[in-house]
UniProtKB/Swiss-Prot annotation:
One of its GO terms (molecular function) is tubulin binding. Pfam families: Prefoldin. The gene is pfd-3. This is Probable prefoldin subunit 3. InterPro entries: PFD3 (IPR016655), Prefoldin (IPR009053), Prefoldin_subunit_alpha (IPR004127).
């Protein structure tokens, strides 16, 4: 169960090695059956915590992708209106629940929320490039999280198998000791 640097995931999550020979593993790790159960339960809990944290992060990041798609669609519409030299009417928010209509003669620029209460004005092409780049970055993170979640699920399964191996080994050892004691009488 010793973790080495080459047995880590991309995010530094240690690999759980399958325990095939429980007795030699216990000897190597210098653990009793009870101590091994505690160690594996702790490891299992850590894996489950990391899994839930990654799932929450993946959900948050995945929710951003449709927002980028919508913004890109709007910018594409603005670019098309500008190319056709068409004006268009839109409604925009003045304050809570107060909207007004405006006619845009020739769209040239758009303002984009960057976060932390920062809005920046871009020309349409640069805005599209920025949003496309940001969408790609978010998609890359979602893909990485998907891969890491697959890895962590494998580690959880391996840890569960190891836990059952330890429990079964303990049961068999107690049965053997009981049989020896009953045979000695």
């Amino acid at each position: 169960m010793s973790d080495t640097a080459d047995s880590l995931s991309a995010r530094g999550i240690p690999k759980s090695e399958l325990i095939e020979d429980v007795e030699s593993w216990l000897t190597k790790e210098k653990l009793s059956i009870e101590e091994a159960e505690v160690v594996l339960r702790e490891k299992y809990g850590k894996y489950k915590y990391v899994e839930s944290s990654m799932l929450a992060q993946k959900v948050r990041m995945s929710e951003k992708i449709p927002e980028f798609e919508n913004s890109l669609s709007i910018i594409d519409t603005l670019i098309a209106k500008r190319a056709a030299d068409e004006s268009f009417e839109t409604t925009f928010l003045l304050s809570d629940d107060v909207y007004t209509k405006a006619t845009v003669q020739k769209p040239e620029k758009v303002s984009i929320w960057l976060g932390a209460n920062v809005m920046v004005e871009y020309d349409l092409e640069n805005a599209r490039k920025l949003l496309d780049k940001n969408r790609g970055s978010v998609q890359k993170v979602v893909d990485e999280l998907t891969n890491e979640l697959s890895y962590i699920k494998d580690q959880i399964t391996t840890t569960e198998v190891n836990m059952s191996h330890i429990v079964n080994f303990g049961v068999n050892k107690r049965r053997a000791a009981l049989a020896v004691n009953n045979g000695a009488k």
